[in-house]
């Protein structure tokens, strides 16, 4: 199925001289419609208050609403999924599952889908993204970053809250009888949504009332204040807490609700085929709009019987026309074209119902526009009508039925508009309620750019993921390092997390120093030292931290001594024995001056008689007494600073592998200490492929990806070499255990690999093909969203974060 799914709508249109004059109505139907309008205009009951206008009897705490003497309803809020950018086979699967979902409802269930786009106070969003000042020297940076976020907010329509609801109801003699059946239907609906991969939330009575309050009071920023205890305490009805100041339906073509003005129209389907983009286009409008689909299932047996009767009637008409032709001397095969068309359509419809799992529905589609002024309302209605026209449909105002239209636009499951259109399952399913997901969380959410489809801000908190491990992937110049620095800066400003960077290219130190961090430059000539034998009592989950530390020192010796065949079993035994000896004094009295160094391990090895011990000691000698002795010192830098950068650019070829392994162990030390303090540790590894090329560092990286999550660690690998991530089954675990992936522009080969591994559709691939710096796809759990980040270049932070030589600010 292509990006625009089209299904037959089976219209019955009156045509004359090639022109379409609208849906074909019988004399009886016309009479009924005229009577309806007269009834609405002349005999409408005048209600005495705004509360009396709201058409329900009682709202219960558990979310069941008694709408009238027999109708009881419940509401479920559901989220969006990616449909418009999905793979064609995925779109087909979504469409088919959605069709099966619609077929679930039998004729005893009333169904209403409500899509409410409502502008809210932008100040609420600004509060969420505002970074409050703190008592430190970084408030100028906070102010600048906060201003950047405020500017990005204005580019989208984050001020527009988009909600999707399904309301379902049944008729019953009592609340008790209704509850059991509604609960069963609710469970089935939730399971159907789960099959579609859609997150859902059944609404309580309070939440349903809040939805109604927000619809009725969209002109006011007054918060919803209500509890069911207040009803008993005050003697008021729940309607008193949700009603607007007034309703005014006197104009006939529009209504007033408080200070807001609105109008309800119905969608007249004239198109021979329907398009799955139509609903999405309505909901993409940047104004207050509510779209409602009221759906009634026709009993299958009755539907088939009705169509058979219609076919019989058409056949009778055909016979009459043929008789007339014979009497007039014409060819009896020449009959009116409309008659032939309707006959063929009716037979195809009957075949669909009998053989293709299609059902018949009566559908009412209502669209409500609201605005602060009449001019804005007319503009919104014009835009809505233009979208309808684009898809060969018409938007018809509900003249003198605005009150019924408004009440039918509330998610309470009541349809007071008797304008229905017969549609099959496939035609109804074309109104797919899914477009693209938004990623906007509150709390400690960080900024990752703008949604490329909606221009809305992407704000997420990786800690909310089941597995916060992450990867930032892209070609050189695509913005990998910049994206990592932006995330680090954001985390530094709004969280208490510690941040550690392994920096093989000396790209991060300007930012680290600006944020008061510690840059540790490790090289053969540096005086910054870190001790590979550092340990703390929390180093392992086990009571004895030496087991895990011994494993690290074995990996280190493997790198130094091992060669092609690695360490032999005897050598591993000797090293393990020596490790336990070297830590005896420190563990007995854990003070810094008793922390062992590499030379202590070397001396213990030298004191042992086995030739293997001497071989290991000899291999270690260059790292103890020789020219590579940079790691034979106690740590003399502040590894406990909140922001630490390990600059290993100058380590040289001989020491780089060992240096990366030792840095990883230092990070593990920090993670274990922070875990005891309930603090998260963010660890960034630039040029991540370098760690994956060596067996020891690759194995250690895999362990980090497995262990970090439950210790409060959030590792992030940054690389341009996707192939190295899939070099072996073991390393592939890193890819599979990353719930956060930030994809920037990709080379052709890597793009194909990633598309297969991450199930990226051709439409989504466009966002990582020849894309500009800072553009791509963000994978957050099961959600995929295209993004763009045009970070302002006239900011101080930009100059500290960019890696472009002409723009870099060196300190």
Model-derived regions, located:
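Hydrophobic anchor at the beta1->P-loop junction of P-loop NTPases
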Residues: 472
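Conserved P-loop NTPase
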Residues: 758-811
